[in-house]
Amino acid sequence: MRISLALAATCLFVFTNSLAGQIRHVDDKDLAAYLAGVTERGRALYAYDQAAWHGTDAFFAIHPDTNGLTHYICMKTAAGWEVAFPKWTETHDRLLVAYEAKPAGGPENFTAVKYDPPREGPDDLVAKERALELAVGDFGTANRPYNTAILPAEDGNLYVYLYPAQTKSDVWPLGGDVRYTISPDGKQILEKRQLHKTILDFQFDPKLKTAAGFHTHVLSDVPEETDVLYVLTRKPSIPEYIGAARHVFAINTDGSIQVVKK
């Protein structure tokens, strides 16, 4: 790939820090394995995001009673991604699944069902709901819609992501996202890492025939999994170049990452 390709006109300056304010740095000897992990998590985020999109569409199509429902939670199963819509009991000691959206013949096709009476939520769903509530409460109020996602982390911990949602079908936001690492029971925040600060909404002008996008990481020297999510979601599908302190990276349209300049 050549950086001389036509690039998106606007550069995004991205600031990354952890809860302790540390700069994200990866040694060159660990870089290949780290980038493979970013790709894996980014692809999983994309799959989660797609399941949430199509699963919630199916959910709202049956005109549900949303009173008391908490967050949607996507779960990867042998049959594909499923989306649960739980709620707490009045005493907040049991989590019940009131609705569920399941795959129906393809990744974009879901069928929603209502459980009457609601089903008891398994322990892993309870932990994920607690983790979401903890992260959302810490994140606070945003001035635009946000999506959430939950992925497995090392040592049984949970990654909870909050990232800006699309508000227009042809505009893709990048930035303003946070990743929390939360204990396996969903009760303790172990790390809060802001992946990007600035939010920019990218809209492509077909007259420009843009071949790739570009943004710069100022306080991080590696791509983030939400960068991969951005590339996999954006239409038209084009690569994204990321300028960091020591390297220039290319995120390809399949989510893989390569170093294009050292």
Predicted regions and their residues:
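Positively charged n-region of N-terminal signal peptides that target proteins for export
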Residues: 1-5
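Bacterial N-terminal signal peptides
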Residues: 6-16
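A generic structural motif
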Residues: 86-88, 165, 183
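A short, surface-exposed beta-strand/turn
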Residues: 95-111, 172-190
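Hydrophobic, aromatic-enriched interface-forming segments
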Residues: 140-181
